[in-house]
Curated annotation (Swiss-Prot):
Domain notes: The Tudor domain may not recognize methylation marks, but rather bind unassembled free histone H3.
Membrane-topology descriptor: Multi-pass membrane protein
Comp. bias regions, Basic residues: 73-88
Record's subcellular location: Nucleus inner membrane; Nucleus; Cytoplasm; Endoplasmic reticulum membrane
Family: Belongs to the ERG4/ERG24 family.
Group of enzyme by EC: oxidoreductase
Modified residues (N6-acetyllysine): 55, 599, 606
Catalytic activities: 5alpha-cholest-8,14-dien-3beta-ol + NADPH + H(+) = 5alpha-cholest-8-en-3beta-ol + NADP(+); 4,4-dimethyl-5alpha-cholesta-8,24-dien-3beta-ol + NADP(+) = 4,4-dimethyl-5alpha-cholesta-8,14,24-trien-3beta-ol + NADPH + H(+); 4,4-dimethyl-8,14-cholestadien-3beta-ol + NADPH + H(+) = 4,4-dimethyl-5alpha-cholest-8-en-3beta-ol + NADP(+)
Protein name per its UniProtKB record: Delta(14)-sterol reductase LBR
InterPro entries documented for this protein: ERG24_DHCR-like, Lamin-B_rcpt_of_tudor, Sterol_reductase_CS, Tudor
C-alpha cells in the first residue's frame, strides 16, 4: 500500500472540488484504506481530498517567481513596431524594463487571483441567513421574510421527510470564469437513470460514518445474540397457560426437535414464491431517490398484486382442506428456520459487499467487519433487476404476518371449539390487516425511508424483516389462541375509535408529506407554510407536520395500542409490541434528528423552535 506524502499539521494547497482553484489548507488526518486526506480550509470547512488534489506550497511559490511571461496581447509582435528603433538615453535598459513589467504583471495576476478567490462563496452545510424566513410555500413571503432567497426551481421545493436521510454535501459556487460541470459515471444498464443536477451545485461523496450507532461493535454483538433469544423467549412464554412475568418459560426443546427439514422446505417455498410474485411484470415502475453519484434505481411496485395472489393461494389451500394448523403446532420450528435463513442471507450479503465499489456502500458502514455485518455494507444489493432489500422490506415478512394471523384465527376456533372466531381475534386480525394493506398500497413511500436510503442491507434488516416482524408482530393473535378474551361492546367501540384515530393521523400525515414531495405547487397545499433550506428543500412547518415533528410515528403508536387492547389486561405480554415499538420510534427519531441537524443546519434549528414536540404533544 503506498505511503502518505503529506504529514498531519502540514500546510499545503488543496484543490476545491469541482474547480481548478487551490486554497491553503491544513492536513488533519490520512485514511490509509481510502487514501484520502482530511483537510481543513481557512473558513473552517473540512473535506476529504485525494493526494492528487493536494500540492505543496513551494510549487506555487516557484511558479509565481518564475512566471515572467507577458500577457498574450503583448507576446504578439505589433506590425507598427516590427522594426527596431533607437532608444532614448534617458530610457532604462531593456532588461530592467522587462523585469519591472514582469513584476507588475505578476502583482496584477496575484490581485486578480485574490479577486477570483473572494468571489467563491463557500456554504458547506451552513444555511444562508434566513432571517425569520418562514414563508407560505407557494405564495408570497411574509413581510419579515423578504430577504429569504427562494429556490431557483419550484420543483426542488420538496418536503423534508425525516426518514429521507440521503446525505449530499452541497456547496454554492459563483466562479467568474469557470463553470462547474457534474461528472456522471457511465453504466450500461437500463435500470438506472440520472436525475438533473442543479446548476451551481455539486455533490461530494459522503465519507463513511465514524460515529457508530446502536452502541458500536459491542452493541451490535449484543443485539445479534439477543434478538434470536428474545424471539424464542416470547413464543415460549406466550404458549404457556400463565404467561405472567413471574413465570419462567419452559426450556427450549432439543435441537433435533426444533430442526425439521419439512419446515425448512415450506419456509423456502414461501420465500421464493414471494420472490417470484415480485418479478411479475405487473405494477408501475418508479425511480428511487438519487444516489451519491446521481443515479436513480428503478423499482417495480407490485406488492398489492403479490398480496392478492398470496390470498388466492391461501384461500385455495383452505378450500382443499390443506392443514394450515401445521404452522401453529410448529411455530417454534418455523421461527428457527427463519432465523437460520436470515443469518445465511446476511453472510451472503456481507460477502458480496466486499467486491462492490465504494460509492455503492451504505453511509452507515464503518469498516469494522462485525458492525458492518450487522448494519449492512452494501446500500442496494441487487441480483439483476431483483432488489434484495426492497423485496425483503415488505413481502416475506409483512405478508407472512397476515398469513400467520389467519392461521392463529383458525387455530383459536379449533382449540377453543368455536364455530366463529372471537371478537377480540377478529379485531386484531382486522386492524393488522388494514395496516399491512395500507403499507402495500402506498409501497412507493418506502423508497424515502431511512431503511432504503441510508442503512445497508445486513443482519439488522434481514433479521427484522424475515423473523422479527412476522413472529413477534403476530404475538397478539398467538396469545388469544390459548387466552380467550370477552369484550363488551362499549369497550369494543372505544378500541375501534382509537384505531381509527391513529390511522387517520398516520395516513393523513404521510399523504400530506407525499403530496408535497410530488407536487409542491399543488393548490390544495397552498395553505401550508415552510422553512426554506440551503439544499433547495423546504421543511413543512404547518399542517400535520406543524403539530409534532413526527405525526406519522404518533399515529403508528396509537394503532399499536389499539390492536393490543383486545387482549385484555391480565398480562403484559400482549403489550410487548407497544413497548418495543415506542422504544424503536424514539430511537429512530433520535437518528432522524441527528441527520437532519447535520443536513439542514440552522433551518432545522428554526423548525425545532416552531415545532418543539417530537412525537407526543406536550410530553416529548
Amino acid at each position: 500500500m503506498p505511503g502518505r506524502k503529506f504529514a498531519d499539521g502540514e500546510v499545503v494547497r488543496g484543490r476545491w472540488p469541482g474547480s481548478s482553484l487551490y486554497y491553503e489548507v491544513e492536513i488533519l488526518s490520512h485514511d490509509s484504506t481510502s487514501q484520502l486526506y482530511t483537510v481543513k480550509y481557512k473558513d473552517g470547512t473540512e473535506l476529504e481530498l485525494k493526494e492528487s488534489d493536494i500540492k505543496p506550497l513551494k510549487s506555487f511559490k516557484q511558479r509565481k517567481s518564475g512566471s515572467t511571461s507577458s500577457s498574450p496581447s503583448r507576446r504578439r509582435s505589433s506590425r507598427s513596431r516590427s522594426r527596431s528603433r533607437s532608444r532614448s538615453p534617458g530610457r532604462a535598459p531593456k532588461g530592467s524594463r522587462r523585469s519591472v513589467s514582469a513584476s507588475y504583471q505578476a502583482d496584477a495576476k496575484e490581485k486578480e487571483m485574490r479577486r477570483e478567490i473572494l468571489q467563491v462563496k463557500l456554504t458547506p452545510l451552513v444555511l444562508k441567513p434566513f432571517a425569520n424566513s418562514v414563508s407560505v410555500y407557494n405564495g408570497e413571503p411574509e413581510h419579515m421574510e423578504k430577504s429569504a432567497t427562494p429556490p431557483k426551481n419550484k420543483q426542488e421545493r420538496v418536503i423534508l421527510s425525516t426518514e429521507d436521510s440521503y446525505i449530499a454535501t452541497q456547496y454554492s459556487l459563483r466562479p467568474r470564469r469557470e463553470e462547474v460541470k457534474p461528472k456522471h459515471r457511465v453504466r450500461g444498464t437500463n435500470l438506472v437513470t440520472r436525475g438533473p443536477v442543479p446548476l451551481g451545485t455539486f455533490q461530494v461523496t459522503t465519507p463513511q460514518r465514524r460515529d457508530l450507532e446502536f452502541g458500536g461493535v459491542p452493541g451490535a454483538l449484543l443485539i445479534m445474540l439477543g434478538l434470536p433469544a428474545c424471539v424464542f423467549l416470547l413464543l415460549l412464554q406466550c404458549a404457556q397457560k400463565d404467561p405472567g412475568l413471574l413465570q419462567f418459560p419452559p426450556p427450549l426443546p432439543a435441537l433435533r426437535e426444533l430442526w425439521e427439514a419439512r419446515v425448512c422446505g415450506v419456509y423456502l417455498l414461501w420465500f421464493f414464491l414471494q420472490a417470484l410474485f415480485s418479478l411479475l411484470p405487473v405494477g408501475k415502475v418508479v425511480e428511487g431517490t438519487p444516489l451519491v453519484d446521481g443515479r436513480r434505481l428503478k423499482y417495480r411496485l407490485n406488492g398489492l398484486y403479490a398480496f392478492i395472489l398470496t390470498s388466492a393461494a391461501v384461500g385455495t389451500a383452505v378450500f382443499w382442506d390443506i392443514e394450515l394448523y401445521y404452522l401453529y403446532t410448529h411455530f417454534l420450528q418455523f421461527a428457527l428456520a427463519a432465523i437460520v435463513f436470515s443469518v445465511v442471507l446476511s453472510v451472503y450479503l456481507y460477502a458480496r459487499s466486499l467486491k462492490v465499489p465504494r460509492d455503492e456502500l451504505s453511509p452507515a458502514s464503518s469498516g469494522n467487519a462485525v458492525y458492518d455485518f450487522f448494519i449492512g455494507r452494501e446500500l442496494n444489493p441487487r441480483i439483476g433487476a431483483f432488489d434484495l432489500k426492497f423485496f425483503c422490506e415488505l413481502r416475506p415478512g409483512l405478508i407472512g404476518w397476515v398469513v400467520i394471523n389467519l392461521v392463529m384465527l383458525l387455530a383459536e376456533m379449533k382449540v377453543q371449539e368455536r364455530s366463529a372466531p372471537s371478537l377480540a381475534m377478529t379485531l386484531v386480525n382486522s386492524f393488522q390487516l388494514l395496516y399491512v394493506v395500507d403499507a402495500l398500497w402506498f409501497e412507493e413511500a418506502l423508497l424515502t425511508t431511512m431503511d432504503i436510503i441510508h442503512d445497508g442491507f445486513g443482519f439488522m434488516l434481514a433479521f427484522g424483516d424475515l423473523v422479527w416482524v412476522p413472529f413477534t408482530y403476530s404475538l397478539q393473535a398467538f396469545y388469544l389462541v390459548n387466552h380467550p378474551q370477552d369484550l363488551s361492546w362499549p369497550l369494543t367501540s372505544v378500541i375501534i375509535a382509537l384505531k381509527l384515530c391513529g390511522y387517520v393521523i398516520f395516513r393523513c400525515a404521510n399523504s400530506q408529506k407525499n403530496a408535497f414531495r410530488k407536487n409542491p405547487t399543488d393548490p390544495k397545499l397552498a395553505h401550508l407554510k415552510t422553512i426554506p433550506t440551503s439544499t433547495w428543500k423546504s421543511l413543512l412547518v404547518s399542517g400535520w407536520w406543524g403539530f409534532v415533528r413526527h405525526p406519522n410515528y404518533l399515529g403508528d403508536l396509537i394503532m399499536a395500542l389499539a390492536w393490543s387492547l383486545p387482549c385484555g389486561f391480565n398480562h403484559i405480554l400482549p403489550y410487548f409490541y407497544v413497548i418495543y415499538f415506542t422504544a424503536l420510534l424514539i430511537h429512530r427519531e433520535a437518528r432522524d434528528e441527528h441527520q437532519c441537524r447535520r443536513k439542514y443546519g440552522l433551518a432545522w434549528e428554526k423548525y425545532c423552535q416552531r415545532v418543539p414536540y417530537r412525537i407526543f404533544p406536550y410530553i416529548y
